[in-house]
Every structure is written in C-alpha cells, then in structure tokens.
Amino acid sequence: MKKKVKILFAIALIFTDVQAGDIVVIGNSNVPKMDVQTVQKVYTGRFVSVDGVSISPVSAKSGTLIRNRFLQDFMNQDEEKYTGYWTVRRYVGKGTPPNELGSPEEVINYVQSTPGGVGYIDEAELKAGMNVVTRK
C-alpha cells in the first residue's frame, strides 16, 4: 500500500510540473519592461522606481507554489532566505516586503488598478492586453 501511495505521489508531482507554465511578471500599463536583475531589485526593495515610474510590487502568499517558483526562478532564493532578508531589512528601517495577495485574480486586479503595480502569475493566468514586464 505504501508503495502505491509513493508511486501515485511521484506521478502527481510529475503531472504538476508538466502543467505549470512559465512565470510572468505583469505590470500596470505604465510600467516599463524589466530584465530579471531589475525585478530582483524591485522585490528586494533596492529599486522603488523604474524609468521614473514608482513601482508597487505585490507577492503571492508565503508557502504557495507560485511564490516558491518565483523565488527560485527569479530571485535565486528559497522562502527562508527571502523572509530572512526582509526581516533584517525591516529591522534596520530599510523598507517592508511586498504585500502578499491570496490568488492570481487578486494580483491581476491589483496590478491593473494600481499605477506602478507589479506582480507575478503563472503564464496560464495571462489574459489578452496584460502588460508582461518580463518572463522566465
């Protein structure tokens, strides 16, 4: 029985990886295109504006698959390292982490309604007319 459960779990992991698309960083219509290094600086609070546009990033909830993928693919960090970075930064008065939203729909709504809004979603959630800032 345990062997069957392990096999089913392994198949589920493979299927999940196959279904997961690329991560896209989306921005409000006034947000310019960014490279990965600029996205890293935005999500670590080192850039608060890009090309004269004040940036207001949001993040997925801690522990979600999309956040873990974003941290790995874009930030080259895991959750523990990223959270630790922001704990220190907040302690020394150098900023606060991006607000966390609970669903892709919330991220999309925030980005579309907030000048300078930036967030990340799975490519499968992308809709026509969205401003894709970068993808990976």
Predicted regions and their residues:
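Flexible loop/hinge segments at secondary-structure junctions
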Residues: 20-136
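N-terminal short leaders/motifs
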Residues: 11-13, 63
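Sec-dependent signal peptide recognition
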Residues: 2-10, 17
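Generic hydrophobic-segment detector
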Residues: 10-11, 35
